[in-house]
């Protein structure tokens, strides 16, 4: 932990040095997307290409979000390898040359904007809800040094605005990032836009599973176990107890996707980690997750959600969950496969899903990207 902290601080000093030597750069009528996930960026870029906006939009993307550059060839896109000094210099230049930065994650890079009042930073975040504690609320902060916390705060203080889809998430951001009410843009979260449109993907045809229902298992990652995954069902259970009616799709979290080889390509269990989450959620009949943010967007579709919480106490202890987790989730917390199977075989209470979605997607109505780009238009005009 101490070595990582030292390296992070050295990285921060290097960024500060770059910012000092590039302080002469003047902002133009440009907006730069600084992204590590595809969902928000895709929704924003689709709206940008359809609309009439006075500013130019660029993309700074990490390897994890590289598909974005391929999907939008008409937009200038630059790969960001955060350990590459040349990439960092170029990134700071692009940011300083822009009037607005839109980001979707925690980047130390945005700390250079703290003394850059002519460039505004908008955090759209990569989730429209949260069941985990993060930021200043993260329980692992107890193991951090004061210097670490100060470094985190430098990043959080670089956010001029944050988009939110609900009062619940607004309150979480205020506690997690130490921000104020006047920084909150209650215009919805861009990544939710596609869920309000009819756009069902034929993944069932692609993977040759016609006539079977899809159970999508999309767990979050465990900091304390990045090398393995516990599946909710065996192939035998899918065949015998669930009567061959379902196929289990497994979507790994990006943080562990390259660490684990599920080695399943059977008729009943398939690794679909390389597919876009949106496409999988549209195709799924049932979602099984745990402490992930996936239910917040999936709930818009009003389809059954189950929670496989076999390590609830351990996760709470190691990572930390929001208060009243069990009363917030719109489905039963199941601690073993038998409980999950029983829930699947029992009629589902859809009213819980609607209440959950209405609560957490209050400001998301399918027009969040347009709302954001219009806000930026007014901001820089």
From Swiss-Prot:
It catalyses: N-acetyl-beta-D-mannosaminyl-(1->4)-N-acetyl-alpha-D-glucosaminyl di-trans,octa-cis-undecaprenyl diphosphate + CDP-glycerol = 4-O-[(2R)-glycerylphospho]-N-acetyl-beta-D-mannosaminyl-(1->4)-N-acetyl-alpha-D-glucosaminyl di-trans,octa-cis-undecaprenyl diphosphate + CMP + H(+). Pathway: Cell wall biogenesis; poly(glycerol phosphate) teichoic acid biosynthesis. Its EC number is 2.7.8.44. Induction: Positively regulated by WalR. Mainly expressed during exponential growth and rapidly shut off as cells enter the stationary phase. GO terms for molecular function: CDP-glycerol glycerophosphotransferase activity. It is found in: Cell membrane. Signal peptide: none annotated. One of its GO terms (biological process) is teichoic acid biosynthetic process. It is a peripheral membrane protein. GO terms for cellular component: plasma membrane. InterPro entries: Glycerophosphate_synth, TagF_C, TagF_N, Teichoic_Acid_Biosynth. It is an enzyme of class 2 (transferase). Keywords: Cell membrane, Cell wall biogenesis/degradation, Membrane, Teichoic acid biosynthesis, Transferase. Catalyzes the addition of a single glycerol phosphate residue to the prenoldiphosphate-linked disaccharide, as a primer for polymerisation by TagF. Belongs to the CDP-glycerol glycerophosphotransferase family. This is Teichoic acid glycerol-phosphate primase.
